[in-house]
Amino acid sequence: MLSGVELSRDEALVLLRSDPANYLSLLAAAARLRSAYFGNSVKLNYLVNLKSGLCPEDCTYCSQRLGSAAQILKYSWLKSEDAIDQAEQGLAGGASRVCFVASGRGPSDRDVDRVAGLVGDFKTRNPQAEVCACLGILKEGQAERLKSCGVDAYNHNLNTSEEKYSEICTTHEFSDRTNTVKAAKAAGLSPCSGLIVGMGESDEELIDALFALRELGSESVPVNFLMPFEGTPLADTWLLTPVKCLQILCVARFVAPRSELRIAGSREMHLRSLQPLALHVANSIFLGDYLTSEGQSAAEDLAMIEDGGFVILDPRASAPQGGVEPVLRKRGAGTELQPNA
């Protein structure tokens, strides 16, 4: 693959099904690709949840879904100054990209104008920062509006394969997601799209999802591991092992060797003690907390990166010297408490 030869679906399936006892050999091969394209750098991304919960969509995996009984934070749009404060704390912690996220099917034109104003103010104060927006399914002209205000990237995950999609969501279709990614890319936004693993997908469905992402040209691929929130249809769904998670990440690297590969939601819960090894395959993480659950402390993230011999893209951050259930986020955006940054 270093010579430019692309991995086939059959080859990817063989690698995904390889003997778990030999995972270190798989990891070493994936690490060579990671090193060739990204050296020893790790990109830190920071999430700001602009609007939490009360989503009309019925995605089975999501704590913000229609009918969710998960005891998450629920709030409408943050004030612009509060969102910027949250984002700047992420930058101070070492993040080079801030991801502004809002729950819902997709934004109204008024919502896009609101985010455009926020991003404009944020970029004026922090011109070096990258901004990714994640607002749901886009309508005509909205991607262009976001691009014009300074948004650099747009996230809209495929989450799973087209074949499995109707099992995890009935309120919109797989094509709604692919069309949004295509629209973002056509508008000049960097396409960020990934998946969620551990939802009961078959090996073939997982491979199909990865190849769909490659065909879309996703430049940043977040790999989320299912958070089985109580109060959602997938509560108590535990189908992954740490080694299986590493195998999935390795295959993702082989399928898209030049893409930013991010270990994303629930990495702490599923990779557990093998989490540091994942940095030899992935070159990006979310710093601190997720949308509705807490991550490990920012200090632990920075220490893990430094201890592994990696460097952060933003040199301002440095590591300090010297249960598995999801923890509901009760700090940061939408609260009076300081964020985990």
UniProtKB/Swiss-Prot annotation:
Q: How is the cofactor bound?
A: Binds 1 [4Fe-4S] cluster. The cluster is coordinated with 3 cysteines and an exchangeable S-adenosyl-L-methionine.
Q: Can you tell me which residues bind [2Fe-2S] cluster? A: 99, 132, 192, 262
Please write the reaction equations for the catalytic activity of this protein: (4R,5S)-dethiobiotin + (sulfur carrier)-SH + 2 reduced [2Fe-2S]-[ferredoxin] + 2 S-adenosyl-L-methionine = (sulfur carrier)-H + biotin + 2 5'-deoxyadenosine + 2 L-methionine + 2 oxidized [2Fe-2S]-[ferredoxin]
Q: Where does [4Fe-4S] cluster bind?
A: 55, 59, 62
Which Gene3D superfamilies is this protein grouped with?
Aldolase class I
Q: List the residue ranges of the region (Disordered).
A: 317-341
Give the EC number.
2.8.1.6
Where do the TM regions start and end? none
Q: Which InterPro entries match?
A: Aldolase_TIM, BATS_dom, Biotin_synth/BioAB, Biotin_synthase, Elp3/MiaA/NifB-like_rSAM, rSAM
User: Sorted alphabetically, which SUPFAM superfamilies does this protein's record hold?
Assistant: Radical SAM enzymes
The cofactors named for this UniProt entry are: [4Fe-4S] cluster; [2Fe-2S] cluster
- Keywords (A to Z) from UniProt: 2Fe-2S, 4Fe-4S, Biotin biosynthesis, Iron, Iron-sulfur, Metal-binding, S-adenosyl-L-methionine, Transferase
- Per UniProt, the enzyme's principal EC class comes to transferase
Q: Transcription regulation: present as a keyword of the record?
A: no
Pathway note: Cofactor biosynthesis; biotin biosynthesis; biotin from 7,8-diaminononanoate: step 2/2
User: PANTHER family per the record?
Assistant: BIOTIN SYNTHASE (PTHR22976), BIOTIN SYNTHASE, MITOCHONDRIAL (PTHR22976:SF2)
Family according to the record = Belongs to the radical SAM superfamily. Biotin synthase family.
The record, for NCBIfam families, names: bioB
Q: What is this protein called?
A: Biotin synthase
Source species taxonomy: Bacteria, Bacillati, Actinomycetota, Actinomycetes, Micrococcales
